[in-house]
A protein has these predicted regions:
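Amphipathic, Lys/Arg-enriched alpha-helical "gate/interface" segment within cytosolic domains
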Residues: 1-157
C-alpha cells in the first residue's frame, strides 16, 4: 500500500490518499503519525480511496482493532473541536470497509464527525468548500506531501 498524507495550508485541509494493497501496519503508522502531530488534527481531512486501493487483506475484526488503536491514541489529546473527515471511494470494492469504519463512534472516541460521500461535489459541500477549493482538491493543487507510508522493499538474499 501507499498512503500519502498531504496538506494545503491555504484552505487548511488535509488530504489522505489510499492506493494499492492496504496493510494493517500502514494504517497503524498513519494513526500514530496523526496522534503525534496534534497541530494537524485541528483541520478537516479528505480521505481519498483510489480505484486501485485493495482492502481485501483487512478484516472487519482488524478494523475493530484499528478503531480501538485510534481511540487509545486520540483520547488523551482531548481535542476541543470536532473535526470533519470525509471519505470518497473511486471504486465500489473498498466501500464495505469504509462503511464499516464509519459505523464506529468517531465523534465520541476521536472528536471527529465523518461522512462517506459519492462525489467530489458532495464531499466539498459537506466540508463547506467553495467551488474553487473543490477544484484544488480534485487536482491536488496546493497540497504538499507531508509523509508517505509504504511497505519496505523486499531485500534480496
Amino acid at each position: 500500500v501507499t498512503v500519502i498524507f498531504r496538506r494545503n495550508e491555504e484552505i487548511e485541509l488535509n488530504l489522505c490518499e489510499f492506493t494499492g494493497a492496504i496493510a494493517l501496519d500502514e494504517l497503524k503508522a498513519v494513526a500514530k503519525y496523526q496522534a503525534d502531530k496534534p497541530d494537524i488534527l485541528g483541520s478537516d481531512t479528505f480521505n481519498l480511496v483510489r480505484a486501485d486501493a485493495d482492502f481485501s487483506a483487512i478484516t472487519f475484526s482488524m478494523l475493530d482493532q484499528m478503531f480501538e488503536h485510534y481511540r487509545r491514541l486520540f483520547m488523551p489529546l482531548r481535542l476541543q473541536i470536532f473535526r470533519r473527515a470525509v471519505w470518497l471511494c473511486e471504486s465500489d470494492a473498498p466501500k464495505a470497509h469504509v462503511a464499516y469504519w464509519l459505523s464506529q463512534d468517531a465523534k465520541e472516541n476521536m472528536s471527529t464527525t465523518v461522512k462517506h460521500c459519492h462525489s467530489f461535489a458532495e464531499a466539498a459541500d459537506w466540508l463547506l468548500l467553495t467551488d474553487a477549493e473543490r477544484g484544488m482538491v480534485e487536482r491536488c493543487e496546493g497540497f504538499v506531501e507531508i509523509i508517505r507510508f509504504q511497505p519496505e522493499p523486499a531485500r534480496g538474499l
